[in-house]
Amino acid sequence: MLKKRKKILCIMALAALAVGGCSGEKKETDAVFRVGVPHLMATYDHTKGFDGWSTTRIGVGQTVVRFDAEGKLVPWLADFDGNVFTVKDVKFSDGSKVTAKDICDSLTNSCEKNVRARDVMKQSRWKVLADNKFEYIGEKSILTDPLFCIAKGNLYTGGKVISYDARKAVVERNGRKYEYIAIGDSTTRGMSIETGEVDAVFDVNPLYYKNREHEEVGGARTIMGRLNMRPGRPLSDPKLRKTLAECIDLASMEKALRGYVLCNPNYSRYTKSNRTYKPGKADKPATLELLFYDSRPEFKIIAEATQMQAKAAGIDIKLKNVHVNALRDMELGGDFDIVLSSTTNIQSGTVENYYRLYFDSASPENTTKYSNPAFDNAKSLQEMQDVIDKDYAVIVYGNPLHNRVSKKKLAKLNPLDFYYDVDEVK
């Protein structure tokens, strides 16, 4: 009888362990996955503001096609054969099926609500062919831009937004909750993985790699110092622009930035500036204001190095650290002399579109008011670069690395940071 009782107790104990084990596994699976990101925009509505990146970064917005980690254009919401697209079996977050009409209406809606969307889509056309087919005539890579996430009202095809503000986004995706926490200061962001506050973090100092899963790739970005040439601004003087540009030792600056290199040519085809380091002196003392934001870890280094080297040329640069969400309004207002930007090279689909976005005289995003018919009429990427180099319209610092540090192994890191991939590798 005693043996029988012991046997029953053992079976109960094993059962309890089994239940406890299953419970523990479920708890780990259901746990909130926290991600530290440089910033979130004020809204996840992809049509508002400049880019719509927050929508894709938090795994909510998806586009018709996307670039994969190898730089290849691949289907996402629709397969394509030439100009004809066939919608996959995908649904909005409320469970309703995505149709070709939904996609065409969404593209039209983006263009109606967003100036940049209208500008980059001005040569493109689309129409519904059938319930699950549509025709798109234009540069396909433009469809990767998060401005063209597919949505119906506030419904997207990725995760469901539980709550959102510029500090934190909570998203439910594939039965799990994700919190995307905006941590602007890169050092604080790095410490968040050190202290265990987050499970993964993007774009931090490599010192946080130790004993953790990490991956870094050549980012699909170019760091530029764009120069305000509006009438009455100091840098409307071409001589001052030349002195400023030539006093900066770009080679030594790249070394300080850990030798950042160009990434996969499918993402970025920017060739190095042909400008030489030739420090001189300004004709007269000049004071300039440089805007930057420190959610990019390299910006503070670049800003301070530029300030120091310009001082030797008789140019006093005042640094102004602003929140990234305030930067655009300041640019549009024209109250700056230099603005540091780190923007995806294939924004709006191609590198050529990227250049035209910032330097074409007719572009609404040309906040520096640079104007040269030779650039507007340029036929090739190299020709565009040669013209802006000759005019000293921009200081090109290089291409930053993109990295991710995590507690566990995650899906391959995409150089194009439209996507913050955090899916765990099983």
Can you name each region flagged by the protein language model?
Residues 281-345:
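Ligand/substrate-recognition segments at binding pockets and active sites
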